[in-house]
């Protein structure tokens, strides 16, 4: 990733983080809502190479660690987002049916979002972080899955156009 692309991507994810903190967190959506930086990063990674996916995960994970609503240790989201975005980029990079089909991309991003939240809870428990009752965690993860399936089709065209403008013709949705 060139320095220009990395800088512009960082500014995009900073803007997404500010929108999440100032608007979406204030909405009090049922089921816990959704994380816009998580969705945008996973969608961005699905359109990218694994290297760009890992860098995307680093940028978005760093901003997610800075969030006031983050209950994990510093670096917790960063590590998980690097791994999740790399995995999504790896799955989507070599398979043109994933990159060329919006429905497959939506399913990939939605399932990766839920798996990332489950991994956050599991690694958080290993780190000694208190998340509350099992039922509340399950409601939050299921609520997030619901919102992700609703929001991902809405943001996919925007993210695809932005990714294509920044990285050229690698995104083909």
PLM regions and their residue ranges:
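Terminal, non-globular segments
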Residues: 1-173
């Amino acid at each position: 990733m060139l320095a220009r692309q990395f800088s512009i991507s960082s500014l995009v994810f900073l803007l997404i983080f500010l929108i999440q903190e100032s608007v979406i967190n204030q909405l009090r959506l049922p089921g816990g809502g959704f994380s816009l930086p998580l969705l945008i990063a996973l969608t961005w990674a699905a359109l990218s190479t694994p290297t760009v996916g890992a860098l995307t995960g680093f940028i978005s994970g760093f901003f997610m660690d800075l969030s006031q609503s983050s209950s994990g240790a510093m670096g917790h989201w960063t590590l998980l987002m690097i791994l999740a975005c790399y995995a999504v980029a790896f799955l989507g990079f070599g398979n043109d049916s994933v990159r060329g089909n919006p429905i497959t991309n939506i399913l990939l991003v939605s399932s990766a979002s839920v798996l990332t939240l489950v991994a956050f809870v599991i690694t958080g428990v290993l780190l000694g972080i208190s998340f509350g009752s099992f039922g509340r965690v399950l409601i939050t993860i299921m609520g997030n899955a619901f919102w992700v399936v609703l929001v991902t089709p809405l943001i996919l065209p925007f993210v695809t156009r932005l990714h294509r403008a920044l990285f050229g013709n690698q995104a083909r949705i």
